[in-house]
Amino acid sequence: IKAFREWQPQVHVDYHEMQAESTYFFPPPAKPVNENIPQVILDGLTEFGKGNAAIFDRFGVSYYTREQYDLYYPGYGDSWPSLNGAIGMTYEQA
């Protein structure tokens, strides 16, 4: 938290691994979304998601968005940064 506050990043990614038989997850997140997250951050999540989807589609890689991993609890690795000025994202990889 101290380093985050000193650096004030514009983008923060929380990377995770899922089961080997899973696909990939990236923003936009599932509902509910914390109502205190600014619209500009939510717009950024959508833009990152569109960019990711375009590349995944281009190469025929399976993925999903908005089905899991909400952005509500303020202590998540994506919501806390989003509540503190960064575009906070969770990525799950197979």
Residue ranges of predicted features:
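Structured catalytic-domain cores with a bias toward divalent-metal coordination
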Residues: 1-94
